[in-house]
Amino acid sequence: DMEAGNLTREFAQELMDCIWVKLNDLNKCRDAASAEGFAGYSLFQNLIAGGQNKDGEDVTNDLSFMCIQASMHVHLPAPSLSVRVWNGSPHEFLIKAAELTRTGIGLPAYYNDEVIIPSLESRGLTLQDARDYNIIGCVEPQKSGKTNGWHDAAFFNMCRPLELVFSNGVDKGVQIGPKTGNVEDMKTFDEFYDAYKAQMDYAIALLVNADNAIDMAHAERAPLPFLASMVDDCIKRGKTLEQGGAVYNFTGPQGFGVANMADALYAVKKLVYDENKITMHDLKMALNTNYGKGLRSD
C-alpha cells in the first residue's frame, strides 16, 4: 500500500500504535500473592522483531522498526517487545532498539541468536526450526506451531538445597532431603559443594516426578483437541498436545534465586574455607537464629 501511494508511513505507524494500545485493553485479575509476584500489568503477550529465517537470512524490515517505534510512542506494558540480535543484524536496527532501551520502560528484551539457536539444536530441534524460534511468555524460546511447551511448570528455589546442607536434610524435625552429613565436618569447599549438589539432585528428582504426574493427568483428564489442531504433528499422530502429539514436547521448570545461590556459595567458600574469617559452626548458628534478628540482647 505504501509503494502504491495508498498509505503513508506516518499513518501506517499510527495504525501500529493503535494495535499497541488495543493490546493493553486486556487485564487479568490475580490473587494477592500472584499480583505481587507478577506485578507490572504483565500478560506476557510477547512480540518478536528482527532475527533470521530458517535459511539463516536476516529478516529485519520496516515493520521491525515500526514495532520499536510503537513502543516508544505509547509507553505501555504490552506487548512484551523482544528483539532477536545476531551477527547479521543491521546496525541501524540495533541503534533503534537501544533508543527504546534508553527510555527506561524496560523494553525491549534482547535475545542472542548466536547462543539460543545452538541451545535449541542441543534439545533436538532441527537447524531450520531453531533459526525460526520465537519467545513465548516472558523469556522462553520455542518453535511456534510445532511445540507443546509447558513453561513455568514449577518454580524451583535454588537456595533451598543450600539451606538443607546446613541441617543434613532436616527441616523442622522432618527428614525432607538426603543425609549429606554434618556440615561442620566438611573440611573442604568441594565437600560442601558436593553436598549441595546432592540436595539439589534429590529435590529436582521430586520436581520431575510431580511434573510428569501432572502431564499424565492433563493427557487423561484435560486434553485440548482444538489447540492440537493448530500444532504439528498432532493430527498426523492422532494425539492431543497433552498426549505428545506435537513435534517437540518440553516441560520447563524455572530456577529461582540463582544469583542469591551463587552469592551464598561464594560467601561460604571465601569466608569459611579460603580466609577462615568465620567457622562453619558459627555460620550455622547465625543461620539458625536468622543472624540474631528478633533476639533480645539480654
Regions from the PLM with identified roles:
Residues 1-298:
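Conserved catalytic cores of very large enzyme subunits
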